[in-house]
UniProtKB/Swiss-Prot annotation:
Pfam family of the protein (one): Ribosomal_S19
Protein name, per record: Small ribosomal subunit protein uS19c
Taxonomic superkingdom: Eukaryota
Function statement: Protein S19 forms a complex with S13 that binds strongly to the 16S ribosomal RNA.
GO term, biological process aspect, one: translation
Places the protein is found: Plastid, Chloroplast
Keywords on record: Chloroplast, Plastid, Ribonucleoprotein, Ribosomal protein, RNA-binding, rRNA-binding
Single GO MF annotation: rRNA binding
HAMAP family named among the record's database cross-references: Ribosomal_uS19 (MF_00531)
UniProt lineage: Eukaryota, Viridiplantae, Streptophyta, Embryophyta, Tracheophyta
Species this protein is from: Gossypium hirsutum
Disulfide bonds: none
């Protein structure tokens, strides 16, 4: 279910403050965050945000096509390595 249009998009306060500070300085530095639920807003475009996937922080460069999506969508949490091989020869 989509979020109501009456409400604003959710962005963590600490993340919003860091982005505003970097926009006023016009500097580029990697922003580390654990907030996967934050929505990408237009002020984030051009920044690199390191999103936590449960084990490490993955640096993601924010583009204009990502606006409206959540940060967690771009940092996968599980690594699928394929189904287990049916190894009948080793059981004998």
């Amino acid at each position: 279910m989509a979020r109501s249009l009456k409400k604003n998009p959710f962005v963590a306060n600490h993340l919003l403050k860091k982005i505003e500070r970097l926009n006023t300085k016009a500097e580029k530095e990697i922003i580390i965050t654990w907030s996967r639920a934050s929505t990408i807003i237009p002020t984030m475009i051009g920044h690199t945000i390191a999103i936590h996937n449960g084990k490490e922080h993955l640096p993601i460069y924010i583009t204009d096509r990502m606006v409206g999506h959540k940060l967690g969508e771009f940092a996968p949490t599980i690594n699928f390595r394929g189904h287990a091989k049916n190894d009948n020869k080793s059981r004998r």
